[in-house]
Amino acid sequence: MTRVPRGYIARRRRTKMRSFASNFRGAHLRLNRMITQQVKRAFVSSHRDRGRQKRDFRRLWITRINAATRVYKVFDSYSKLIHNLYKKKLILNRKMLAQVAVSNPNNLYTISNKIKIIN
């Protein structure tokens, strides 16, 4: 029986996986089975960490806003600041507030003066 050379489909699949693994090192770059395992693992990690990144940044923004409100005596806490923002219907998200708190705390103070409730 004559030998039949393999088609291009498997080779195309392997080269596609190899292109994903172009920055790997050692056997993870050279051996096809290791490449497929590591690429699958990398995809799982990247998918998981896209969700985690959103949570981490939100936590970072909240921490920055809370620190700025306490240091500059804007409010007693972060939660009171956010509560009064919602009461006054000011649409400022946490990312914007954190940037203001870090770069220019005076503007945070003026924002707080706008939303403070006069009894």
Swiss-Prot record:
Compartments (UniProt record): Plastid, Chloroplast
Gene Ontology CC: chloroplast; ribonucleoprotein complex; ribosome
A Pfam family hit: Ribosomal_L20
Gene Ontology biological process terms in this record: ribosomal large subunit assembly; translation
PROSITE patterns the record matches: RIBOSOMAL_L20
InterPro entries: Ribosomal_bL20, RIBOSOMAL_L20_CS, Ribosomal_protein_bL20_C
GO MF annotation terms: rRNA binding; structural constituent of ribosome
Main localisation: plastid
Keywords: Chloroplast, Plastid, Ribonucleoprotein, Ribosomal protein, RNA-binding, rRNA-binding
Family: Belongs to the bacterial ribosomal protein bL20 family.
Function: Binds directly to 23S ribosomal RNA and is necessary for the in vitro assembly process of the 50S ribosomal subunit. It is not involved in the protein synthesizing functions of that subunit.
The protein's name in its UniProt record: Large ribosomal subunit protein bL20c
